[in-house]
UniProtKB/Swiss-Prot annotation:
One of its GO terms (molecular function) is electron transfer activity. The keyword DNA-binding does not apply. The lineage of its organism: Bacteria, Pseudomonadati, Pseudomonadota, Alphaproteobacteria, Rickettsiales. The keyword Metal-binding applies. Residues 5-107 form the 2Fe-2S ferredoxin-type domain. Its cofactor is [2Fe-2S] cluster. SUPFAM superfamilies: 2Fe-2S ferredoxin-like (SSF54292). [2Fe-2S] cluster binds at residues 42, 48, 51, 88. This is 2Fe-2S ferredoxin. It comes from Rickettsia prowazekii (strain Madrid E). CDD domains: fer2 (cd00207). InterPro entries: 2Fe-2S_ferredoxin-like_sf (IPR036010), 2Fe-2S_ferredoxin-type (IPR001041), Adrenodoxin-like (IPR001055), Adrenodoxin_Fe-S_BS (IPR018298), Beta-grasp_dom_sf (IPR012675).
Length: 112
């Protein structure tokens, strides 16, 4: 049986939705499998910033540093914060049990 952890999505700064999610999947995959509005226009290929999310500092600090490619995409994200990451690049581990993921109120999809 796959080990699962709790992931709480914060929507529009008010609604919270907690789901159980299998370790090894990305935040983007979990959002999509739970019908949450996190776009992911490039389907996780690190070619857009539409899966931009904000994390609490505690969980942000548990992640590996963003790659240069992720940082380049984050520069295009709407409402960038110090704890912003791309949902497609956050892979769930046991250490992230209880993570809270804030969904932005808007995204910026730049078509190339």
């Amino acid at each position: 049986m796959l080990r699962k952890i709790k992931v709480t999505f914060i929507i529009n700064d008010e609604e919270e939705r907690t789901v159980e999610a299998p370790i090894g999947l990305s935040i983007l995959e979990i959002a999509h499998s739970n019908d949450l509005d996190l776009e992911g226009a490039c389907e996780g290929s690190l070619a857009c910033a539409t899966c931009h999310v904000m994390l609490e500092e505690e969980f942000y600090n548990k992640l590996k540093k963003p790659t240069e490619a992720e940082e380049d995409m984050l520069d295009l994200a709407f409402g960038l914060t110090d704890t912003s990451r791309l949902g497609c690049q956050i892979i769930l581990t046991e250490e992230l049990d209880g993570i809270k993921v804030r969904l932005p109120s808007a995204t910026r999809n730049i078509k190339l």
